[in-house]
Amino acid sequence: MAAAPLKVCIVGSGNWGSAVAKIIGNNVKKLQKFASTVKMWVFEETVNGRKLTDIINNDHENVKYLPGHKLPENVVAMSNLSEAVQDADLLVFVIPHQFIHRICDEITGRVPKKALGITLIKGIDEGPEGLKLISDIIREKMGIDISVLMGANIANEVAAEKFCETTIGSKVMENGLLFKELLQTPNFRITVVDDADTVELCGALKNIVAVGAGFCDGLRCGDNTKAAVIRLGLMEMIAFARIFCKGQVSTATFLESCGVADLITTCYGGRNRRVAEAFARTGKTIEELEKEMLNGQKLQGPQTSAEVYRILKQKGLLDKFPLFTAVYQICYESRPVQEMLSCLQSHPEHT
């Protein structure tokens, strides 16, 4: 007898979550291995007097976070998290990283023990020993195997079906390949690697570098300076991974889409760069700019810089990571944006 089709639940429905829902919804219709209905948990909001779940389920569009892109009709929005994840075989986590503890606590015990997860969340957390990856939190709280997906994937371009690549990191290769089957399309090409922790760290740390790139744009520094920010940022990403990753760190992983490609696209096209440029030019706070420019969605770069700063400070390593440190101090300690340039001029890479 054929195995029952695998039920998929997407935990999150922001800009990226909705773009991924479009891919998964279309793919499961063609693949017998997966159940044809995809549940998507939506943090309920009212938009123009209507519930967001009602808009998605009736108009098949997330008008708040992914306007202009129709979602497949087999994607069902649900506001009750416990009901959405009930009996799910495959969980796709795509929420702001600061909510992961609360979400895991709410759904632990409601998901089958054999369920598998994949996190698309770009961020890190702090534990008593320092760095804690989002995948570690999900694994520890829920007791399920978890893969990660990171890459040069600006959500609106993915939703518009423009060609891009991405990387899945999985400690159990078979599980990574299953998620590849669920997610790959002719225009969304996936490579699976086993260096999962490095893949995940790339996704978090590149947002800090993108904030630095945005500061340079705000200061009108030019392309050469921005290229230096990208290169020095990449060097700090590699150094950070070598210090804090528990397993082997392969330099080749930084050449995958999750590494240098994601870093480039985020430093030229992402919202971390855009908001950082506005921060440098207007003098407004990050919080004010989030409200104005992002519909209130949280920016990952500044928050990740704060977590990285505390982890580095605890280990006495701030002087080894001047770019990461400068981004934090400019965002949160009222240091002048011009300090971005000083940190480049005196970077230990040049001594």
From Swiss-Prot:
Tissue: Most highly expressed in heart tissue, with lower levels in the skeletal muscle, kidney, lung and other organs.
Quaternary structure, from the entry: Interacts with SCN5A.
A GO molecular function held by the record: glycerol-3-phosphate dehydrogenase (NAD+) activity
Protein keywords: Brugada syndrome, Cytoplasm, Disease variant, NAD, Oxidoreductase
Catalytic reaction(s) noted: sn-glycerol 3-phosphate + NAD(+) = dihydroxyacetone phosphate + NADH + H(+)
SUPFAM superfamilies xref list: 6-phosphogluconate dehydrogenase C-terminal domain-like, NAD(P)-binding Rossmann-fold domains
Family: Belongs to the NAD-dependent glycerol-3-phosphate dehydrogenase family.
Taxonomic source organism: Homo sapiens
Protein name per its UniProtKB record: Glycerol-3-phosphate dehydrogenase 1-like protein
One GO location term (cellular component): extracellular exosome
Organism domain of life: Eukaryota
Function: Plays a role in regulating cardiac sodium current; decreased enzymatic activity with resulting increased levels of glycerol 3-phosphate activating the DPD1L-dependent SCN5A phosphorylation pathway, may ultimately lead to decreased sodium current; cardiac sodium current may also be reduced due to alterations of NAD(H) balance induced by DPD1L.
Chain sites annotated for binding NAD(+): 12-17, 155, 271, 298, 300
Record keyword Ion transport present: no
EC number(s) reported in the record: 1.1.1.8
Disease: Brugada syndrome 2: A tachyarrhythmia characterized by right bundle branch block and ST segment elevation on an electrocardiogram (ECG). It can cause the ventricles to beat so fast that the blood is prevented from circulating efficiently in the body. When this situation occurs, the individual will faint and may die in a few minutes if the heart is not reset.
Binding positions for substrate per the UniProt entry: 122, 271-272
Subcellular location(s) of the protein: Cytoplasm
List of catalytic residues: 206 (proton acceptor)
